[in-house]
């Protein structure tokens, strides 16, 4: 079971949204990490065959997915960043409706919906209307619809967008439970979404995969070192201008800084272990905080 992406490219006029991307996925969780606008959504839309690439190919066990038509789509489960639903449908009715669209027989659909509602902890809320659900409940209903056909490939585009911290943790745990014997590709611009659950992390910037590997491999790829030290309030701006500052913690009379630098920033600086958050700052810089519309 292997999904292979070969030199995948997508252009919109003169703009290249995805630029010669290549990687291979087998069973496990893959985290596609990048700022909004990096090309993650465009890549996922090609992987789900919603749009065709300008160049390159996507192969499932050696077969071109665009030539497999319905066979490939039967293997897919997809949760887009914004998924549609009828607001007056209950959660149960919504899932049964999606099951019918996916060609699942009514008797089998009832059993599958019941199982998934319990798995995503929505069984007791199954009669609630979709329009009355919290953001977290909607995302859990979304993951349930993506899992209706027990897909071999589960693709999740910014699945924790708009969720509070507790719902993010709950969602991550759910993804881990559902990963099992399947490929899970999860895109996000939030490091904590994938830091502890992804078998492999793919950093995407300007339409390209800049680096990939396990979390430890990605962290060790960063050439800069990480330092912490305290400075008086009057010196904070100077360090902000001179270095990549990963974190500022206010303390009496000044601040404790976490700084990325190849050399020791000052004599008081202590080197500490780098994290994936530090790597994200290194590769994406100021754009790491950009929340523009995804591409």
Q: How should these model regions be labeled?
A:
Residues 129-133:
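Conserved ABC ATPase signature
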Residues 35-39:
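Walker A (P-loop) phosphate-binding loop of ABC-type ATPase nucleotide-binding domains
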Residues 154-158:
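Catalytic Walker B motif of ABC-type/P-loop ATPase nucleotide-binding domains
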Residues 96, 100, 107-125:
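Conserved ABC ATPase "signature" region
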Residues 56-67, 71-72:
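Conserved ABC transporter NBD signature motif
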């Amino acid at each position: 079971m292997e999904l292979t992406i070969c030199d995948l490219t997508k252009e919109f006029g003169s703009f290249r949204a995805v630029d010669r991307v290549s990687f291979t996925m087998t069973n496990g969780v893959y985290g596609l990490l990048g700022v909004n606008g990096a090309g993650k959504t465009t890549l996922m839309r090609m992987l789900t065959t919603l749009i065709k690439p300008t160049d390159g190919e996507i192969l499932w066990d050696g077969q071109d997915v665009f030539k497999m038509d319905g066979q490939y789509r039967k293997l897919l489960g997809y949760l887009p960043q914004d998924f549609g639903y009828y607001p007056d449908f209950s959660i149960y009715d919504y899932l049964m409706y999606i099951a019918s669209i996916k060609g699942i027989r009514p008797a089998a659909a009832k059993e599958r919906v019941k199982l998934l509602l319990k798995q995503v902890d929505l069984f007791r809320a199954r009669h609630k209307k979709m329009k009355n659900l919290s953001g977290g409940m909607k995302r859990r209903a979304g993951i349930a619809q993506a899992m209706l056909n027990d897909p071999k490939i589960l693709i999740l585009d910014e699945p924790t967008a708009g969720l509070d911290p507790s719902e993010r943790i709950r969602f991550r745990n759910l993804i881990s439970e559902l990963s099992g014997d399947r490929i899970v590709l999860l895109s996000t611009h939030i490091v904590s979404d994938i830091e502890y659950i992804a078998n492999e992390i793919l950093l995407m910037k300007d339409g390209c995969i800049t680096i990939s590997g396990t979390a430890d491999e990605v962290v060790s790829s960063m050439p800069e070192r990480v330092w912490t030290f305290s400075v008086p309030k009057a010196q904070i701006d100077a360090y902000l201008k001179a270095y990549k500052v990963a974190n500022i913690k206010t303390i009496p009379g000044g601040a404790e800084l976490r700084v990325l630098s190849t050399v020791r920033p000052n004599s008081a600086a202590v080197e500490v272990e780098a994290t994936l958050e530090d790597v994200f700052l290194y590769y994406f810089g100021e754009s790491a905080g950009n929340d523009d519309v995804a591409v």
